[in-house]
Amino acid sequence: TYLGQKVRIMHEGNVVYGAVRNHGSLNKKELEITDIIIDIGAVSREDAMGHVACGDPVSFDTDYRELLNDRLCARGLDDRLGGYIILEAAKKAKERGCTCGIYAATTVGEELTKHGAAWCASRIAPTLAVVLDVTYTSDYEGTRAIENGEILLGGGPVFLHNSFSHKMVVERLEKAARNIHIKYQWENGCGRTCTDADAIHMAGRGIPTTVMSIPLRYMHNPAEVCSMEDVQGCIDVLAEFLCGIGSDICLKPLEG
C-alpha cells in the first residue's frame, strides 16, 4: 500500500524526502489518484514548488529522514520521542542543579495492558508523574479540527485537560512553558487518555498525573512526522518544570 509510506523524490539531481499521507477515512474506500498526497514538510505551495516539480520520479524510502523546516520522518516516533525527551530533560535539569529526585522510566505494554507503567508507579510511589506521549495533529487534509481540536505540527508541546489529568500539575507545566517563552497547545478529553497515565494515576494511593504530548502526523504508520522544534520545546519545558519542584510542593487543590 502507498498510504503511510516514506518516499524519495528525485528533483534536478537532488533527493527530497517525504511521506504519503494517511487518514482513517482512506481505509474505507478504494483509493483514487487524488488520495495519494505527499508531505515534504513544506508550509505553502510556493515552498513546495521550490523543492519539487511536476514529473519528478518518486520511490519508497526506508530510512529516517529530515524533512524541510526542521521536521523528522521515521517509523516508531510513537513513542521513541517520549523516551528521548525524558532522558534529555532529566540531563538538562541535572545540569541546572535540580534538587528533586527524578525517576525516568520507559515501560512495556502501553498499547495493551499498561502493566509496565502500573508496576513501576506502584513500586516508586512518586509525588507526581508526567507521561510523555504523542498526539494526533489536525493540520493536514483529511483531519477535522472541529471534531478533535486544533493541534498543529510546530505549535509546541500539548497539555491535556481531562478527568485523569491533575489540574495543578498541568498548571505547573503551563507556567514552566511561559517562564521560558515556549509556545504550547491544549487538548481536552472526558475519559481515558489511552496512555500510561491511565494506569499511573490509579497506582498505590493515587498519583497526581498528567500527559505532555508531542504533535505527530500519520500516527501508527511507517512514516510518522514530527517537528524537532516541538521536541526541543518539550525537553525545555520538562526541564524547567523539574527545576521548579521542591520538597515543599503541595498538590492538594484546597491547600496548594
Language model segments and positions:
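N-terminal hydrophobic/helix-forming segments and targeting peptides
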Residues: T1-G256
